[in-house]
């Protein structure tokens, strides 16, 4: 969780005296020695015949020494040392702890000559799981699912990059997810909320890392696995001041790098994207972090790939889905990743159109290894896997369209699941894109339906697509540099898009050729997730420090935001009314500017506006949007609040309110779909959908009934998607259920209705066309 209010990571460390010791250490002379040995019987102690291991790296966190030919080492400890650690070599595991706690010895200026570390050979797999910001303090179902995942997947370790969260969380996870009960090494890094106030070391220095060290051992160390060297580093600032400085960590990294072969691939861990810690003299391939509550893959100018991930337990601030990241690598440091989305479990939903069956086949913990269609009479048709979520088969031509069939799937955990075909309601066509789709609302113009995709895993298949509105055929695709999560804009025959790396594109809507592209200013938050808005020859992109207006024809910057409000993220799409541009900065507030000049007009920073993520609706010269627990109408130019209703729900969704028939319709994070009376803002009705199969609304994690989708009106009904994997149709006046379409995965976009045809996308990258009559 980011609560640093966007201060530079290093401001707290600029004073030369911050880390000066409070006691005289000139007489300090603690020495530590011992042996690193091959523990043949793996009992955690050195027995007769078990020999020492030469050239093993041992460190006190400041300097590094190597064992001699007999496996013995001796180190003169730094006065601020806390642990003596052996850096686990490739192909080995520790049979006792990889560190020895020397804090009491340091305080007493004692020496210790009996530090023994056992190592045993083990298999390595070139793979690990990554999660971050787990922030729980009680045992929940997702921990059991993580143990299932660990039992099924052969991996070298599991990395948790910080914000285990506060003393209660640290102590809980030091027991709940250990090497022993997870069946592999657990690598924890310290986050800003893991630095706990109220502690001093034996020299009187602030000691924010004390509780973390009590629970997990050293906050920085390294190890090697599957040909790659891994460096674990600590968060540099946080809720309490640590005893270490950035210079301490940088100096230790240089010491550490002396112990590995030149050119060996290196990956680094930290709670944040601490680019200042990346050494220039090393072959750093990846930096793994959390903190920003995002699912992001991005490559810097230096060539280092940064991977951010949240947790499988909950959704994150930028509405990134609840997931862990599986990272696979080889000895050259080449990396591929895959997201495992939760809490979806043993899940099959099948559709058939024009003789082709496509099925969602997915389980968060295990992998589908086989899927097949079971026809009437028991005949089976093998399915092929299109992506990590979708399987496909072509049915025999002789089958009647109304035939009933089942889909069977087998998973690596031994489970076999069978599901009956969904009875289709007017499915005209269905197209599976080579990437996933997120909040991007489909746009139709002429013969084309435009959508955009994301690839948070490897950024290989990110593109804008033009599909034939009648058949779903992909007429063209335009590759972009990274994921597009927000809305496209269409104006004067040009599609405008923005990817998560802050690149804005103008694309010819007829042939998919890029007319211009431009990189806009990055902000403190690393990911551009908001939608693009275009009108009157201008393209509006970004939020906070990246907010700008571009000339739609040339991409030239017309103005940039000079009112540098902060922001964690923004997933809504900016809107204009009466010449005013309304934008959003999650955790900070709503901000409004003159659309022509960029002049700052007004801001709202109360709690309802701070925790607001909905795209605003425009009604005449006003904006209507949701706050954390409220729906508001404000005058566009002045910001005057004209109406406000507060409700016992959380509106932490992207859902854009629909104003229709004297009502406001909108989705909630936790309680389904809501209709309120526009005249007095009183609740008209509330419809409860099913619990989310994948969480996307920030901090949802406990079977919340989430609707991120924006509603559309159709006759006297309202249609919207939901995170439970359904598209719903309800009566506007009373919320009476009319019908629902079972898609199987979250529908996050705003459905589109054109000529009595309903278009929408799902999380897996399926595009659907249904006839409404």
Please describe what each predicted stretch is.
Residues 27-32, 40, 88-90, 95-172:
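N-terminal active-site segment of His-dependent metallophosphoesterases
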Residues 30-33, 38-62, 368-372:
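Short, ordered, surface-exposed loop/turn motifs in non-cytosolic proteins
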Residues 44-46, 52, 59-72, 76, ...:
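Short, acidic Ser/Thr/Gly-rich low-complexity loop/linker segments typical of extracellular
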Residues 62-64, 79-94, 568:
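A short, solvent-exposed beta-strand micro-motif common in secreted/extracellular proteins
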Residues 295-377, 394-397, 402-408, 417:
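Binuclear metal-dependent phosphoesterase catalytic core
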Residues 468-471, 508-512, 551-555, 594-598, ...:
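Short loop/turn segments that connect beta-strands within beta-propeller blades
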């Amino acid at each position: 969780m980011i609560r640093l209010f966007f201060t530079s990571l290093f401001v707290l460390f600029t004073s030369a005296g911050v880390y000066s010791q409070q006691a005289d250490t000139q007489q300090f002379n603690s020495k530590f020695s011992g042996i690193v040995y091959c523990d043949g019987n793996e009992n955690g102690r050195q027995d007769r015949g078990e020999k020492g291991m030469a050239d093993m790296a041992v460190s006190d966190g400041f300097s590094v020494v190597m064992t001699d030919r007999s496996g013995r080492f001796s180190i003169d400890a730094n006065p601020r040392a806390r642990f003596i650690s052996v850096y686990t070599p490739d192909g080995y595991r520790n049979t006792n702890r990889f560190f020895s706690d020397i804090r009491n010895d340091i305080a007493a200026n004692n020496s210790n000559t009996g530090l023994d570390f056992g190592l045993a050979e083990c298999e390595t797999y070139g793979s690990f799981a990554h999660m971050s910001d787990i922030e729980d303090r009680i045992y929940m179902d997702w921990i059991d699912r993580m143990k299932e995942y660990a039992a099924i997947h052969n991996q070298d370790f599991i990395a948790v990059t910080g914000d285990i969260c506060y003393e209660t969380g640290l102590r809980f996870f030091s027991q709940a997810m250990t090497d022993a009960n997870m069946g592999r090494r657990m690598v924890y890094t310290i986050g800003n909320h893991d630095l706990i106030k109220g502690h001093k070391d034996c020299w009187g220095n602030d000691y924010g890392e004390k509780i973390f060290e009590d629970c997990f051992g050293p906050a920085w160390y390294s190890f090697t696995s599957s040909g790659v060297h891994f460096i674990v580093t600590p968060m540099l600032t946080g809720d309490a001041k640590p005893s270490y400085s950035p210079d301490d960590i940088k100096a230790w990294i240089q010491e550490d790098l002396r112990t590995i072969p030149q050119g060996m691939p290196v990956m680094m861990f930290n709670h944040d994207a601490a680019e200042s810690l990346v050494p220039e003299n090393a072959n750093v391939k990846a930096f793994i972090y959390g903190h920003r509550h995002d699912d992001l893959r991005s490559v810097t100018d230096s060539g280092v790939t940064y991977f951010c991930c949240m947790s499988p337990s909950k959704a994150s601030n930028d509405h990134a889905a609840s997931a862990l990241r599986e990272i696979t690598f080889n000895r050259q440091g080449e990396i591929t990743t895959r997201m495992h989305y939760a809490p979806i479990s043993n899940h099959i939903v099948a559709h058939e159109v024009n003789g082709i069956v496509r099925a969602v086949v997915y389980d968060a913990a295990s992998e589908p290894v086989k899927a097949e269609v079971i026809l009437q009479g028991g005949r089976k048709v093998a399915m092929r896997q299109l992506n990590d979520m979708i399987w496909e088969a072509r049915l025999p031509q002789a089958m009647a369209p109304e035939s009933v069939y089942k889909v069977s799937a087998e998973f690596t955990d031994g489970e076999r699941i069978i599901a009956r075909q969904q009875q289709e309601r007017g499915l005209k066509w269905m197209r599976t894109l080579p990437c996933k789709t997120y909040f991007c609302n489909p746009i139709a113009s002429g013969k084309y339906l435009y959508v955009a995709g994301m690839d948070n895993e490897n950024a290989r298949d990110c593109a804008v697509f033009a599909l034939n509105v009648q058949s779903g055929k992909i007429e063209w695709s335009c590759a972009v540099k990274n994921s597009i999560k927000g809305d496209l804009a269409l104006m004067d025959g040009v599609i405008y898009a923005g990817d998560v790396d802050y690149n804005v594109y103008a694309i010819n809507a007829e042939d998919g050729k890029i007319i211009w592209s431009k990189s806009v200013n990055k902000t403190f938050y690393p990911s551009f997730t908001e939608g693009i808005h275009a009108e009157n020859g201008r393209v509006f992109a970004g939020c906070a420090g990246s907010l700008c207006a571009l000339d739609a024809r040339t991409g030239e910057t017309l103005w940039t935001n000079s009112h540098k409000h902060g922001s964690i993220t923004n997933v809504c799409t900016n809107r204009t009314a009466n010449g005013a541009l309304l934008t959003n900065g999650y955790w900070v507030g709503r901000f409004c500017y003159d659309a022509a000049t960029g002049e700052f007009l007004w801001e709202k920073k109360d709690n309802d506006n701070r925790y607001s993520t909905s795209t605003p609706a425009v009604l005449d010269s006003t904006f209507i949007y949701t706050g954390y627990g409220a729906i508001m109408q404000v005058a566009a130019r002045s910001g005057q609040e004209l109406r406000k209703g507060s409700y016992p729900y959380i509106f932490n969704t992207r859902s854009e309110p629909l104003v229709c028939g004297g009502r406001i319709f909108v989705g909630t994070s936790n309680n389904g779909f809501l209709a309120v009376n526009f005249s007095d803002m009183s609740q008209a009705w509330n419809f409860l959908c099913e619990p989310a199969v994948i969480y996307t609304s920030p901090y949802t994690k406990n079977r919340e009934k989430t609707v991120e989708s924006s509603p559309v009106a159709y006759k006297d009904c309202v249609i919207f998607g939901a995170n439970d994997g359904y598209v719903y149709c309800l009566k506007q006046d009373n919320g009476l259920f009319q019908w629902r379409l079972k898609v199987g995965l979250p529908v996050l976009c705003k459905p589109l209705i054109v000529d009595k045809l309903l278009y929408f996308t799902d999380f897996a990258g399926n595009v659907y066309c249904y006839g409404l009559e």
